[in-house]
Amino acid sequence: MALARAASGQAVTLVPPDGPLAAQTAALVKADQFEAIHLVVPEGREIAEHAVEGPITLFCLEGEAEIGLPDGRVTLAAGQWLYLDGGVPHSVYGTRASRLLLTIVLLAAPGT
């Protein structure tokens, strides 16, 4: 079941009480100030190291993922939340099949 983009004021079920779970990464909303993404990381899959300009948060909805950081790795299990400053290089590895809620703060370009 694919997740559709959310409209302002619309409730979205990210963790259904039963039935099939969303199995693919999908942008939930992208506004001028932030973007929210339902991120699916299969077991054994790695998202290579990268960085984004603005701060991010990762909330583990299901499974377990390792976040690679310059100073080591942090394990996120279901129910755990992580904040990263903008520009921090990081990778994501699915130690178990995982679903994460990724929020990215979008910084305005200078002069806009």
Predicted segment positions?
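Short acidic-glycine-tyrosine-enriched beta hairpin
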Residues: 71-87
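Short beta-strand His + acidic residue motifs that chelate non-heme Fe in jelly-roll/DSBH
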Residues: 47-49, 67-68, 84, 89-95
